[in-house]
Amino acid sequence: MIVLLSGAKKNIGDFLITERARRLFDYILDDQIIILDRFKNLESDIDLINSARFLVLCGGPAYARDIYKGIYPLVEDLTKIKVPIIPFGLGWCGKPSDPMQFSFNSDSKRLL
């Protein structure tokens, strides 16, 4: 089983990224795929997530200062997630004209 986190309810780009990830993993791994809402806290889904092969973060302007807890709330304690976390098609929220000014907050650095 694979768990995908999707923000597809917010925009079509996230839907397309999630759908492509679903098709790709279905084709390559022929495995059960579960799609969860990336906007919610996942405490109640932690057993499901930890029974998966891995957790995939699908789309969104996620490479942002607050990727963890802001863009992807996940769980309060990251050590509860025992499977690999894989980014797939994540966008960047920095300014192309000044990339050196971009940084992650301390919570996000723990996720990365």
Task: Name these PLM-found stretches.
Residues 1-112:
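Aromatic- and Gly/Pro-rich donor/ligand-binding loops
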